[in-house]
Design a protein with these regions (language model features):
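Short, well-structured N-terminal submotif of metal-dependent ribonuclease cores
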Residues: 1-63, 70-87, 153
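Short, solvent-exposed loop/turn segments at secondary-structure junctions
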Residues: 26-27, 63-66, 163-165, 178
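A short acidic, often aromatic-flanked loop/helix-cap motif at beta-alpha or helix-coil junctions
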Residues: 65, 122-128, 177-182
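Acidic, PIN/NYN-like endoribonuclease modules and their adjacent C-terminal/linker elements
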Residues: 1-14, 133, 147-182
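Acidic active-site catalytic centers that drive phospho-/nucleotidyl reactions
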Residues: 22-24, 143, 161
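Well-ordered, non-membrane alpha-helical segments in soluble/globular domains
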Residues: 37-46, 98-108
């Protein structure tokens, strides 16, 4: 299939469509920035339409891990410098982090409740090719693995990541920069 990047605001969701949401989308919907970011409504509306049309949303451990780690780091970076530990790991091991970890877990559970789990394709991915593309220095390793998952399971990727390279997958986004990609 030739890659197609489509505007999520204009996409007509159909029964049988299957999606993989990138971690940045989960951050916009269930992350700490959800109420502060105008993009939240666009992707939340798409999520409602996906669910209304009985489409499937898949998630793998890479994306869930990215969501959890990004949420944690966001909270760490928001701390007042006076009380902020120097190292993230010190913060993560502090009593202060416990309530944040609980909030992250609550939101991660919301995600997994509405998703089908899939494996990360580590065993079957063409890792030498993925590493060859990675060593060229212009692509993220996890993003490449996400592409492998989408290709193997015929999933459409929902992302706001402008750095995503058009590959042999379909992408839904509200990101104007990504929509301009040929």
């Amino acid at each position: 299939m030739s890659p197609q990047i489509s505007d999520i605001k204009k996409y007509a969701f159909h029964v049988g469509d299957s999606f993989l949401f990138d971690a940045n989308i989960w951050m916009l919907i269930y992350g700490p920035i959800a109420n502060m970011d105008g993009r939240t409504e666009v992707y939340s509306a798409a999520l409602r339409e996906i669910r209304k049309n009985n489409c499937l949303i898949f998630i793998d451990i890479l994306i869930l891990s990215e969501f959890i780690n990004a949420f944690s780091r966001f909270e760490f970076n928001q701390l007042n410098p006076i009380i902020k530990p120097q190292k993230f790991k010190d913060f993560r091991n502090s009593a202060q982090f416990k309530s944040i970890a609980q909030e992250i877990s609550i939101n991660a559970r919301k995600i997994i409740k509405i998703c089908c789990r899939c494996d990360s394709m580590f065993e079957s991915a063409d890792l030498p090719n993925v590493l060859t593309r990675y060593e060229q220095g212009n692509s993220d390793f996890n993003d490449q693995m996400i592409v492998e998952i989408c290709k193997s399971k015929d999933l459409m990727l929902v992302t706001h990541d402008a750095d995503f390279k058009p590959e042999d997958i379909n992408i839904l986004t509200a990101n104007k920069k990504l929509l301009k990609n040929p």
